[in-house]
Amino acid sequence: MEAPPVTTMPVSGGTINMMEYLLQGSILDQGLESLLHRLRGLCDNMEPETFADHESVYLLKGQQASPFVLRARRPLDRPGAPWHLRYLGQPEAGDRSRHTLVRNCVDIATSDVLPEFLQEMGFRMDHEFVARGHLFRKGVMKVAVYKVFRVLVAGAAEGAEPLSLSYLVELSAVAPAGQDNIADEVRGFAEQLRPLVQLEKIDPKRLM
């Protein structure tokens, strides 16, 4: 099995070949309302957007040690909306001094034949999950607060069960490469959410 889902920002208009600046954390279920109240006061949209997405993670194994990973996601709450294909690169080497995790992010809208296309290309589905939660915006930054649900029957998002008694919290911004000042903005906003949630740089390799 590949590592648990890392970053599950809701489906939205994606931008090709950009850098993602990311901090992550979690809160227990009982802390949700306090965090949402705090975010309403800090963010541009007083009431958060809600989202419910079904994501499948596909692997392509080759000669390299690590498989190539792509993520296919579809919104469950917006019938007819496009699927999205997402690639998340490895954290940039030498970014220890940066305040956030930094990695390449490719996000494109596709038709609903995406799963079949990936299988024809030789990918196999490793795991799938449902993410349901709230999305706030602050300038170029996004804050997603969501719960991950385990899919019990392959391909069927209905009846998915909560994976834990907590919510994941992701603070991110997507911008062209070289705009490292974005990392400072993300870290500064994260400081305003303490002590409700501790957002940190989490290297996906630590989860494997």
Curated annotation (Swiss-Prot):
Keywords: Activator, Nucleus, Transcription, Transcription regulation. GO terms for biological process: regulation of transcription by RNA polymerase II. It is found in: Nucleus. GO terms for molecular function: transcription coregulator activity. Component of the Mediator complex, a coactivator involved in the regulated transcription of nearly all RNA polymerase II-dependent genes. Mediator functions as a bridge to convey information from gene-specific regulatory proteins to the basal RNA polymerase II transcription machinery. Mediator is recruited to promoters by direct interactions with regulatory proteins and serves as a scaffold for the assembly of a functional preinitiation complex with RNA polymerase II and the general transcription factors. Belongs to the Mediator complex subunit 18 family. This is Mediator of RNA polymerase II transcription subunit 18. It comes from Xenopus tropicalis. The lineage of its organism: Eukaryota, Metazoa, Chordata, Craniata, Vertebrata. The gene is med18.
